[in-house]
């Protein structure tokens, strides 16, 4: 079954979520579980209601967020005011929540990154999005299914997707042309095969600028159609152990990574946080890099026409791999403050944020996917794809994936990602073999 469900699938119960009895009882009394408890009554007078929204969007993305919040505050006729508060990194928001309590959470709506999903489900703090959807009769088919799949457990959507991205391959078309390469490689094997030509004929200082990033490791398991962890990738029940060691997936990834590094096709450029891989690419040193679809605008801006940027699907490990990609980014979680008027106001604001018009604007400004399918029909969206045809790659890759490649849910995902990155680094630095690195990952997570 796991071979079939590959990178996802499954259902959950409050027991499997790992919630303690107290948490489960508390959240049930507060009407905040998806397991048949009383949902909020959305038929409320929201005049004069103020809700607090915590988010982690800085820079250009932060400006786009402020624009949407201000637009809602000016245009909504329900007397609702949204106070948006920038929290810094996603980790900071989760840490701030840890000291909160039901009924007094400090915020009504929070933006939490993908790998915080299991933690939030288990917390007992939330009003599952499905309850608001059901109470309002909202048509959930409007949400892009491959995006919704990540945040869906036991057919319940727990949070509303908002800023979603997948990784893609970026390449320097001029270098490829100079090297006489007409076909863009679709696998790491394929990149290894053209590495020398990119250097000797294409003039690349490094063929592939590859950041050490746990997100890529997770994607390459999905690309092989293999699970990260047991219990249906932590979706049938809380994961108790990793499976990437026993199913061979991790070793395939590390062997391919080491081969690229040994051949000097992908030298060590450090971890993703350093941005070295991106700057190596935009400065014309690297022929290829991997990065988020949400980096497209920044990359094009930094290249500034000095060469033509091409985009392609995120590569597989081997040519025959047939898995898909999983979603990154973040989603919106409604917090339970035992206040139906605030819940109703929060839901109205969420509906505004995911409206086709808002999503087309958000996509054009940030490069994140529109999470609402109808956004594709908005002129803003069409104009943006016409201006940046590279973005079509991201849309096609998303549509070509399947909900079963939604990816794993782990309560310790942030820590697990750090461990994976440390062990890949150890391997690249020659401190351990790929086999030993996989063993170390599995024993620590």
Q: Model-derived features: where do they sit?
A:
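Extracytoplasmic "Venus flytrap"/periplasmic binding protein-like
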Residues: 71, 75-143, 174-186, 280, ...
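Hinge/lid segment of periplasmic solute-binding proteins
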Residues: 30-45, 113-168, 192, 220-223, ...
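A structural signal for short loop-to-beta-strand junctions that line the ligand-binding cleft
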Residues: 99-100, 108, 136-175, 206-210, ...
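Short, solvent-exposed loop/beta-turn-alpha elements that line the ligand-binding surface or hinge
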Residues: 41-44, 130-143, 227-252, 301-304, ...
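Glycine-centered hinge/linker elements that transmit conformational signals in sensory
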Residues: 195-196, 239-270
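Extracytoplasmic/periplasmic substrate-recognition and gating elements
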Residues: 74-75, 81, 179, 255, ...
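Periplasmic solute-binding protein
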Residues: 115-125, 130, 146-183, 210-237, ...
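C-terminal capping/gating helix-and-loop segments adjacent to ligand/active sites or protein-protein/ligand interfaces
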Residues: 325-326, 375-376, 390-444
């Amino acid at each position: 079954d796991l071979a079939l469900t590959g990178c996802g699938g499954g259902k959950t119960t409050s027991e499997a979520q790992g919630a303690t009895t107290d948490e489960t009882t508390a959240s049930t009394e507060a009407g905040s579980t998806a397991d048949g408890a009383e949902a909020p009554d959305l038929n409320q007078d929201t005049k004069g209601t103020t809700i607090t929204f915590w988010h982690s969007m800085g820079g250009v993305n932060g400006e786009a967020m402020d624009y949407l919040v201000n637009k809602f505050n000016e245009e909504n006729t329900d007397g609702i005011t949204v106070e948006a508060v920038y929290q810094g990194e996603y980790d900071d928001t989760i840490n701030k929540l840890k000291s909160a309590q039901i009924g007094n959470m400090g915020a009504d709506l929070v933006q939490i990154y993908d790998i915080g999903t299991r933690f939030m489900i288990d917390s007992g703090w939330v009003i599952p999005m499905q309850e608001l959807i059901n109470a309002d009769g909202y048509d959930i088919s409007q949400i892009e299914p491959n995006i919704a799949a990540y945040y869906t457990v036991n057919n319940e959507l727990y949070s509303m997707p908002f800023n979603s991205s997948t990784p893609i391959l970026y390449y320097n078309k001029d270098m490829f042309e100079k090297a006489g390469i007409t076909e863009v490689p679709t696998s790491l094997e394929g990149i290894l095969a053209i590495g020398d030509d990119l250097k000797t004929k294409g003039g690349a200082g490094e063929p592939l600028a590859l950041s050490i990033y746990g997100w890529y490791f997770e994607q390459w398991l999905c690309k092989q159609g293999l699970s990260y962890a047991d219990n249906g990738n932590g979706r049938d029940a809380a994961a108790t152990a990793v499976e990437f060691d026993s199913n061979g997936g991790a070793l395939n990834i590390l062997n391919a990574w080491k081969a690229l590094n040994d051949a000097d096709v992908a030298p060590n450029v450090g971890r993703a946080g350093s941005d070295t891989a991106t700057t190596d690419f935009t400065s014309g040193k690297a022929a290829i890099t991997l990065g988020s679809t949400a980096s497209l605008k920044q990359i094009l801006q930094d290249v500034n026409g000095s060469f033509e940027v091409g985009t392609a699907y995120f590569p597989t490990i081997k040519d025959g791999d047939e898995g898909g990609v999983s979603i990154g980014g973040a989603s919106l979680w409604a917090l339970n403050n035992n206040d139906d008027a605030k819940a109703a106001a929060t839901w109205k604001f969420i509906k505004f944020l995911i409206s086709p018009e808002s999503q087309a604007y958000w996509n054009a400004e940030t490069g994140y996917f529109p999470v609402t399918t109808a956004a594709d029909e908005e002129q803003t969206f069409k104009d943006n794809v016409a201006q940046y045809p590279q973005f079509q790659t991201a849309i096609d890759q998303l549509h070509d994936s399947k909900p079963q490649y939604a990816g794993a849910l782990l309560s310790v995902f942030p820590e697990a990602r750090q461990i994976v990155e440390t062990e890949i680094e150890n391997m690249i630095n020659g401190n351990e073999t790929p086999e030993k690195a996989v063993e170390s990952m599995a024993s620590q997570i």
